[in-house]
Design a protein with these regions (language model features):
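N-terminal secretory signal peptides that target proteins for export/translocation
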Residues: 1-11
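Sec-dependent N-terminal signal peptides
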Residues: 11-22
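C-terminal motif of bacterial Sec signal peptides marking the signal peptidase cleavage site
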Residues: 26-29
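Bacterial Sec-exported substrate-binding components of ABC uptake systems
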Residues: 31-152, 259-288, 355, 409, ...
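A short, structured surface patch at a secondary-structure boundary
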Residues: 105-204, 208-213
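Extracytoplasmic substrate-binding proteins
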Residues: 186, 197-199, 203-296, 320-321, ...
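Flexible, glycine-rich surface segments
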Residues: 276-362
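C-terminal soluble interaction/assembly domains
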Residues: 326-341, 345-413
Length: 429
């Protein structure tokens, strides 16, 4: 009986202790939760150099997509929030890089033989401007001046043609959408005579000016006046896919990385599939490429994107062993000597409409085997009424179609269903 009472007392004591322990845990848990709730409403203050930015003091859900047409609302900025959930990796291009931070990106245009490194801080609208020595650009941009025709396609693809407020030369535009935009809106032509009109640019004060990549004192002057001038160096890429990837420079300014990433991935997939088809060719084809202007024959260097396009098309290029990424400057005697046995000639002078016309310009072209076999090609299939060639506008952004054209020229049996996009064979007369 005593043993039973002792056992019962011990049992009650144990249960009582357990109840006290559980109650203590519950109390501590409630206090911890209360502390967590308190901390969630207090976000560290972010020092801002922008007077119109207010730091939030309440928890705001993180964005699931980039802001392509709006700013961070006043009072909702949070330094811990990633405002760029849609990012882009640079997989093919060598000429630029993108670095992402929570509320800003760093766009770097790499140095070339003629230009220095450039870095720009792209700050999400509504976010504070970070302390930096680099020029800052508020994104998404609302206005842009474009110097090169290869810059147009990305704005078309990203649905942002309306942001184009200035163009270099209207005469070189081939896209109907851009032509219509220029005609119906107050779009400034700022380099009609191949000279940048700085006063016109300054008056318009665009968010960004994209240069043509060539050195010009006018660009330096504009940059000194706080108009960001981005060097557009796509033409120095060594691969066609690398050149197409310059679309990411545009999309980073528009916060449209998601759209550009899908577009580029699709093109890259197409390109790889066409390369695999070209590899099945059973015959060796040698190509001469380039054209003469004022006594000098300009040919793609052996490390250029054109030379690598020919390689991917399973075409042997006459000057493939040269290390140049740009153009070769040759005399016609060298061209005849080295290219005399080439099977095809691509990128022949665009002003020629017949082979006969070319021979009248210089009879020595008649020594070339490609001329004898009437296998001379120009990229003039899509030239509009004002003489603008779509090849110089859209081909850089669609290397898959460009590669398909080249494969069809050299290995027509492998691309029966492909219709030429830019190239056409010159008739004899």
């Amino acid at each position: 009986m005593i043993r039973h009472l002792i056992y019962s007392s011990q049992k009650r004591a144990i249960w009582f202790s357990l109840l006290v322990f559980v109650g203590l845990l519950f109390t501590l848990g409630c206090e911890a939760n209360a502390n967590i709730e308190d901390s969630s409403t207090v976000i560290p203050t972010v020092q801002s150099s922008a007077a119109n930015v207010t730091v939030t003091s309440t928890l705001v859900p993180s964005p699931t997509v980039n802001r392509t047409s709006s700013c961070i609302p006043d009072g909702e900025f949070n330094s811990d929030t990633d405002y760029f959930p849609d990012k882009a990796n640079v997989n093919y291009a060598n000429g630029f890089s993108l670095e992402y931070h929570n509320s800003f990106k760093i766009l770097t245009i790499n140095a070339t033989d003629s230009t220095a490194d450039q870095s720009f801080v792209l700050v999400q609208c509504g976010a504070p401007i970070p302390d930096t020595i680099f020029p800052t650009i508020t994104i998404p941009i609302e206005s842009v001046f474009l110097s090169s025709t290869t810059q147009y396609p990305s704005f078309i693809e990203l649905g942002s043609v309306a942001k184009i407020k200035g163009i270099g030369q209207a005469a070189f535009i081939s896209s109907k959408e851009i032509i219509d935009h220029v005609k119906t809106n107050e779009v400034v032509e700022f380099a009609a005579n191949f000279e940048v009109g700085t006063e016109v640019v300054i008056e318009s004060n665009p968010d960004v000016l994209m240069s043509n990549g060539f050195s010009d004192p006018a660009y330096t002057k504009l940059a000194q006046l706080n108009i960001p001038v981005i060097n557009w160096m796509d033409w120095q890429e060594t691969s066609a896919l690398g050149r197409a990837e310059w679309m990411l420079v545009t999309s980073s300014l528009l916060n449209q990385e998601l759209t550009s990433r899908v577009f580029i991935n699709t093109i890259a997939k197409n390109y790889e599939e066409i390369t695999e088809i070209a590899a099945q060719a059973r015959s060796d084809v040698v190509a001469l490429a380039g054209s003469a202007f004022q006594g000098t024959f300009y040919a793609p260097g052996g490390a250029s994107y054109v030379a690598n396009l020919l390689k991917d098309a399973n075409i042997e290029y006459v000057w493939s062993q040269t290390p140049d990424t740009g153009s070769l400057y040759l005399d016609l005697e060298s061209v005849i000597a080295e290219g005399v046995t080439a099977d095809i000639w691509i990128n022949a002078p665009t002003q020629w409409t017949t082979i006969e016309e070319g021979l009248s310009e210089d009879p020595r072209y008649g020594e070339l085997e490609s001329v004898k076999q009437s296998n001379v090609w120009t990229h003039t299939l899509l030239v509009n009424e004002q003489g603008a060639d779509d090849y110089f506008e859209r081909a850089a952004s669609r290397p898959d179609l460009l590669l398909a054209d080249l494969v069809k020229i050299a290995h027509p049996d492998l691309m029966n269903e492909h219709k030429f996009e830019w190239y056409q064979q010159l008739p004899n007369k």
